[in-house]
Amino acid sequence: MSYNYQHIIVKPIGGRIGAEISGVDLSSNLVEDVVNEINQALLQYKTIFFKGQHQLDDIGQEAFAARLGTPLNHPTVPTKKGSNHILELDSRGGRADTWHTDITFIENYPKASILRSVIAPEVGGDTVWANTTAAYEHLPESLKVLADSLRAVHSNSYDYAASASITTEQREKYREIFTATEYET
């Protein structure tokens, strides 16, 4: 799929996933043509990056997210104090240090997740993405037939299944933040 971008600069960064977008200030009042092209790049590349957006604050992030669609709050984790939709994560606690998908255990799952690094570590802190569409498309036909015949229960119960080796204080803090509501689709 090829698209002729007129309002943003799109530089692919991987064979099957990812592009860096430049020539746009996400904190500004973006014109509809720019928003449409950002959406097109998201569809085409699955993961898009905007570097150097230091001027973007919580209000700007929420405004940008709303231009891409209706923001969806995490059903079991409260939003950041003073925001409508932002889920604040930090490097402590290892809450997302395994392969996962964001909120896909609910019936009407989000189109995308928007991450904004406010303070990045000098080393580590890497986030990795996978293109499951490309993975499926490159399966041998026999495995596609098998995959198409399978059914599964998708749930967030894993979030509560294991007891991590954390202190009592950390566990209490975790329970303050997370609501132990299980979803299943």
Where in the sequence are the language-model features?
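Non-heme Fe(II) oxygenase catalytic core, chiefly the N-lobe of the double-stranded beta-helix
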Residues: 2-185
